[in-house]
Amino acid sequence: MLALKLSFAALAVAIAAPTFAAQPPYMDDRSTAASLVRSYYNAINRQEYARAYTYFGDSNAPQSYASFAAGYANTASVTVATGTATDDGAAGSTYFTLPVAIDAVSTSGAHTQFAGCYTTRLVQPGIQDPPVTPMFIFKAKLSPAHGNIRYLLPQCAP
């Protein structure tokens, strides 16, 4: 009888316990333009907006941190697709242009797609003094799009 009561108690706890969505594993890879952009959206998906904000570098963020974080208040998740990056060298830096398409899911479950180009910048590590600046998002331009993100990747001029 005690075993039966314990079984019902365990079942009641299991039913009443909230179900949490699995959080994606942490990713912070700034070695290529594609991995940098995937890491950026990994931070968004984990609601680590301060980490996401740092992917724009020390002085390249498009807006204040408060506005940036507030812009994701109704975002539940983002799926990203990337194309092939092209590179363009400049004195001491390499710029990479990357086609990107995303599917953003709101907290209400609505899906919205965007497509565009990200430009990342790598200041050559061999010419830097500490602290070394890793690759960062130099600029990003996304526009509304519709459809499967695998087919929305645009052509990006270097």
Task: Cite the ranges covered by each PLM segment.
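Bacterial N-terminal signal peptides that target proteins for export
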Residues: 1-8
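N-terminal signal peptide c-region/cleavage motif recognized by signal peptidases
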Residues: 16-18
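Short solvent-exposed beta->alpha transition segments
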Residues: 23-24, 34-35, 39, 49-95
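Short helix-capping and inter-helix turn/linker motifs at the boundaries of alpha-helical repeat units
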Residues: 27-31
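Exposed beta-sheet edge and beta->alpha loop/turn motif
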Residues: 91-158
